[in-house]
């Protein structure tokens, strides 16, 4: 289940806000310019589906958000717990960074933790199946896929080479807990 916790950036122990309600999550994130939506497939997505089958199941939403935000390319990324490069992949974006284009992800299956650092607050968003998150360009954040990553996500890009992390060099991400899903997520 999706979850948003908001902390003061100086107090990683006690959240000021904690909710699993999708509407409450969307309302809180909207205040900082982040979009949070729930999507539903127009057809079942079976385990082992090709990227084309995944995108076809969400075509109406993909086309809508691409038109609204000017995305030029869309792809599907799939990470499994047995991936031999999982530790390297996890470590890639664990430190605070930003991108020069929006980071938009839709979770077809599995989960991951986006953590945003905005105005002396830390927004910890657990995204799960059917969640779309759109993080505006320039927003400081980090992403944790967990020690045994399992997710399938649709990614949106305005420029194929524009999605590069620019790291801040701060240690704030290390002050907050790493992602450990409450229970394993099964492919959907």
Curated annotation (Swiss-Prot):
**What cofactor is needed?**
Fe(2+); Ni(2+)
Q: Which reaction does it catalyse?
A: 1,2-dihydroxy-5-(methylsulfanyl)pent-1-en-3-one + O2 = 3-(methylsulfanyl)propanoate + CO + formate + 2 H(+); 1,2-dihydroxy-5-(methylsulfanyl)pent-1-en-3-one + O2 = 4-methylsulfanyl-2-oxobutanoate + formate + 2 H(+)
- Site May play a role in metal incorporation in vivo: which residues? 96
Residues involved in Fe(2+) binding: 97, 99, 103, 141
List residue numbers at the site (Important to generate the dianion): 105
Enumerate the Pfam families for this protein. ARD
Instruction: Report the co-factor binding details.
Output: Binds 1 Fe(2+) cation per monomer. Binds 1 nickel ion per monomer.
| Residues engaged in binding Ni(2+) | 97, 99, 103, 141
Q: Tell me, what is one Gene Ontology molecular-function annotation carried by this entry?
A: acireductone dioxygenase (Ni2+-requiring) activity
SUPFAM superfamilies documented for this protein = RmlC-like cupins
Q: Which UniProt keywords apply?
A: Amino-acid biosynthesis, Dioxygenase, Iron, Metal-binding, Methionine biosynthesis, Nickel, Oxidoreductase
Q: Is Hydrolase set as a keyword in this record?
A: no
Q: Annotated pathway, please?
A: Amino-acid biosynthesis; L-methionine biosynthesis via salvage pathway; L-methionine from S-methyl-5-thio-alpha-D-ribose 1-phosphate: step 5/6
InterPro entries in alphabetical order = ARD, ARD_bac, RmlC-like_jellyroll, RmlC_Cupin_sf
Q: Where is this site: May play a role in transmitting local conformational changes?
A: 102
Is the keyword Iron assigned to this protein? yes
Any idea of its EC number? Answer: 1.13.11.54, 1.13.11.53
In its UniProt record, which GO terms are filed under biological process?
A: L-methionine salvage from methylthioadenosine; L-methionine salvage from S-adenosylmethionine
Assembly and interaction partners: Monomer.
Family label: Belongs to the acireductone dioxygenase (ARD) family.
Q: What does this protein do?
A: Catalyzes 2 different reactions between oxygen and the acireductone 1,2-dihydroxy-3-keto-5-methylthiopentene (DHK-MTPene) depending upon the metal bound in the active site. Fe-containing acireductone dioxygenase (Fe-ARD) produces formate and 2-keto-4-methylthiobutyrate (KMTB), the alpha-ketoacid precursor of methionine in the methionine recycle pathway. Ni-containing acireductone dioxygenase (Ni-ARD) produces methylthiopropionate, carbon monoxide and formate, and does not lie on the methionine recycle pathway.
- What's the protein here called? Acireductone dioxygenase
Organism placement in taxonomy: Bacteria, Pseudomonadati, Pseudomonadota, Gammaproteobacteria, Lysobacterales
Q: Which gene encodes it?
A: mtnD
